[in-house]
Amino acid sequence: MNSIIELTDYYSSNNYAPLKLVISKGKGVKVWDTDGKQYIDCISGFSVANQGHCHPTIVKAMTEQASKLSIISRVLYSDNLGKWEEKICHLAKKDKVLSLNSGTEAVEAAIKIARKWGSEVKGITDGQVEIIAMNNNFHGRTLGSLSLSNHDAYKAGFHPLLQGTTTVDFGDIEQLTQAISPNTAAIILEPIQGEGGVNIPPKGYIQAVRQLCDKHQILMIADEIQVGLGRTGKWFAMEWEQVVPDIYILGKALGGGLYPVSAVLANNDVMRVLTPGTHGSTFGGNPLAIAISTAALDVLKDEQLVERSERLGSFLLKALLQLKHPSIKEIRGRGLFIGIELNTDAAPFVDQLIQRGILCKDTHRTIIRLSPPLVIDKEEIHQIVAAFQDVFKN
C-alpha cells in the first residue's frame, strides 16, 4: 500500500491530499483496500455511487454498449440519446435537456444560459448581467463555477474571475432581497449544501426564493449535482419544499458510479437561447454515457432507491441523534445525507471511524459527512451506528 501511495504522490499534481488508504475493489455498499480490509463506504465518491459500486445492471449496460458503439459526436444522431432525453425530461418535468459530462461543466453551461437569457429575454445590457449565489456554496472549481464561491482560499491566485457575481448568506431571505438589482438574471443555490456541511435552509426559505424569482423575473437555478437523484430521499431535494426551479443541474449519480454524466434541464422559454454553435461538448451525450445513465436512472426507479433513502436515512438519523458526547454540536440530515457537526476538529474522529471499517470524510474541518450508497441495508446502518458509539465512547 505504501509503495502505491508513494508512486502516486510522486507523479500526481498536488491539488489533493487523500486519506492514506488505497482502495482496489468495490461492490454495493462496501469497498476493500489493497490489504483486503473491508469498509462500509459512507463517501460514495461524494454521492456518485448512489446505486452502489459496480451495480450489475449498470455494468451490463456499459459493457454491451461499449462493444457496440461508444462515441460519434453530436454532429450525428445516436439511437439511444432521444429515449434518455425523454426519460430525464419527464423525470424533471422540463422540456429540454443539455447533456454534458462533469458537474462543474454543467454549472458553467447553466451560467452561460442564464447570462444569455438575461440579455436576450430580460433585456439586461450584455456584459452587465448579474448572478447571485449563496455563501458556503460549492458549484465546482472551473473559473465560472469558482466565480460563484465566497471561499477566498479556493479563489486565491486564479483572478480575474467572472464579473457580475455576488454571494449572500444561505437561508437569509432578507439579505437575498437586498442583493437583487434590475440586472439580476439568476439565483443559483444548492437546496441542501453538500460540501458546505449538509446545511439545510430554514423551512420556507426555498419557497421564498421562488417567490422572489417570480416577482423580479429571475431564473431560479437548483444545483442538484450532489443532493439530487435520491440522495436526500427525494428525486430532487427541491421537492422537500414542493418548489420547481427554472433550471436543474444534475451530475454525479447520473452516471451510476461508472461514467461522468451531467445535465442541465430547463423549459423551452429558457433553453431556446442556445442555438447551434452557442455551446457544445465533445463527449456530452455520447452513446456509452447515455446507455450507462439510462441504466442508472432505471436502477433508482426499479429498486425504489429514492424511497429507500428516505426510509433508511430517517432510521440512521434517529439512531445518530441518540449519540451523547460533549464534542457533538449538531446532527442534521435528509435521507441518506447526514452531517455530524462537532465543536472540535473532526479529523481524529474520522481516523477512528476508518479504523473501525467506516469510510467517511470530514468537510470544513468540523463536520463529518455521511452519504452511503442508497442500496445500504439496516444491518450495515447498525454497523455505522455501532462504530460511532464506540468512537465517541472511547
From Swiss-Prot:
Entry's Gene Ontology BP terms: arginine metabolic process; L-proline biosynthetic process
Keywords annotated in UniProt: Amino-acid biosynthesis, Aminotransferase, Cytoplasm, Proline biosynthesis, Pyridoxal phosphate, Transferase
CDD domains documented for this protein: OAT_like (cd00610)
Pfam families tied to this protein: Aminotran_3
Top enzyme class: transferase
Disulfide bonds: none
Gene Ontology molecular functions: identical protein binding; ornithine aminotransferase activity; pyridoxal phosphate binding
Pathway per the UniProt entry: Amino-acid biosynthesis; L-proline biosynthesis; L-glutamate 5-semialdehyde from L-ornithine: step 1/1
Subcellular location: Cytoplasm
InterPro entries named among the record's database cross-references: AcOrn/SuccOrn_fam, Aminotrans_3, Aminotrans_3_PPA_site, Class-III_PLP-dep_AT, Orn_aminotrans, Ornith_aminotrans_bact, PyrdxlP-dep_Trfase, PyrdxlP-dep_Trfase_major
Assigned EC number: 2.6.1.13
Residues recorded as bearing N6-(pyridoxal phosphate)lysine in the entry: K252
Chemical reaction(s) catalysed: a 2-oxocarboxylate + L-ornithine = L-glutamate 5-semialdehyde + an L-alpha-amino acid
Family to which this protein belongs: Belongs to the class-III pyridoxal-phosphate-dependent aminotransferase family. OAT subfamily.
Function, in words: Catalyzes the interconversion of ornithine to glutamate semialdehyde.
HAMAP family assigned: Ornith_aminotrans_3
Protein's name according to its UniProt entry: Ornithine aminotransferase 1
Organism for this UniProt entry: Staphylococcus aureus (strain Mu50 / ATCC 700699)
Gene: rocD1
